[in-house]
Regions:
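Conserved N-terminal subdomain of the carbohydrate kinase-like
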Residues: 1-72, 269-275
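Hydrophobic beta-strand scaffold residues
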Residues: 12, 98-100, 131
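Active-site beta-loop-alpha junctions enriched in small/polar residues
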Residues: 43, 72, 103-107, 135, ...
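Charged helix-capping and loop-helix junction motifs
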Residues: 54, 81-86, 112-121
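A short helix->loop->beta-strand "cap" motif at the edges of active sites that frequently abuts
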Residues: 90-97, 173-177
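Short beta-strand/loop segments at the ligand-binding rim of alpha/beta enzyme cores
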Residues: 94-99, 103, 108
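Conserved phosphate/ATP/ADP-binding segment of small-molecule kinases
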Residues: 108-203
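Conserved post-catalytic alpha-helical subdomain immediately downstream of the catalytic base
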Residues: 189, 204-275
Length: 275
């Protein structure tokens, strides 16, 4: 696994090892009238076995600009949750920007005292940039999401509804400067119109709808979305529209790639973005 990360030039110096194995999941693809099914097997895995205090965050944050965290980590165990919030507190003190992916997975919150809604809301309160799909935002904020009912790329987003929705979210998360929502309508197992909306400093941004048909593999599409957005922000920080356009193009490409990782590079994403 470490060699795979290094293959893409990622710095693995601060990765620690633990547990008996890597976590796994089993995914049954949707087809026709049958929904997809995901089974997580994380017992005795590295994250599951993480103990509070195992990670020394100070040297990690010394040269960091952004700390990106996931709700999935908080779902693994009480120790993983406490470790996450230790990191958030130190990142804030050291001036490291905090971004988060809500990443709500209901099948993971099993440890005694686990409270997904309260924990995710607290995680979001630390963040200057928050990403999630419609349902995840509803879990984290308890605000009913706006239905996305696109049947093709001609669908029009209700600007006023999203402006009001983002204003309500901003009251709950006053530190957050950018809020990004992934919108997907699963018409059929292999037909998903996809887009995203962004609120940045109180301004609404929209982008094109990709009418993806056929979908090859939807796993990891939201990860590709947020990764592309963070990459774009680091490169074009003064152009929120370009960042959103790049992010949704990155997510759209992932729908055409088998597996849960997107291997698309910047040039390939820009090519799709400019179509």
């Amino acid at each position: 696994a470490l060699l795979h990360l290094r293959e893409f030039g990622l710095d693995t110096r601060h990765i620690i090892k633990g547990g008996d194995r890597l976590g796994t999941y089993y995914f049954e693809s949707a087809a026709s009238m049958r929904n997809s099914v995901v089974v997580y097997d994380r017992n005795n895995s590295s994250f599951y076995s993480l103990k509070h205090g195992d990670i020394d965050w100070k040297p990690i944050f010394d040269d960091a600009k952004i700390f990106h965290c996931s709700g999935i980590t908080c779902a693994m165990s009480k120790d993983a949750l406490d470790t996450t919030f230790d990191a958030l507190e130190l990142a804030e003190k050291m001036g490291v920007e905090i971004t988060c992916d809500i990443n709500y997975r209901k099948n993971l919150w099993h440890y005694p005292g686990a409270d997904a809604k309260t924990t995710l809301h607290k995680l979001m309160e630390y963040s200057s940039f928050i990403f999630g799909d419609q349902n995840e935002w509803e879990v984290g904020s308890s605000l009913t999401h706006i239905p996305f009912e696109a049947m093709d790329s001609s669908y029009k987003i209700d600007d006023d509804a999203y402006i009001a929705y983002f204003k309500a979210l901003q009251k709950q998360f006053p530190r957050c400067k950018r809020m990004l929502i992934a919108l997907r309508n699963q018409i059929a197992s292999s037909h998903h119109p996809l887009t995203g909306v962004l609120s940045s400093e109180g301004k609404l941004y929209k982008t094109k709808i990709y009418d993806i048909n056929p979908v090859i593999d939807p796993m990891g599409c939201d990860d590709a979305f947020v990764a592309a957005f963070i990459h774009a922000r680091m490169k074009w920080s003064d152009d929120d529209q370009r960042c959103l356009d790049f992010a949704i193009a990155g997510s759209a490409i992932k729908n055409t790639i088998i597996g849960d990782q997107s291997l698309a590079n910047e040039d390939e994403i820009i090519e799709v973005m400019n179509q």
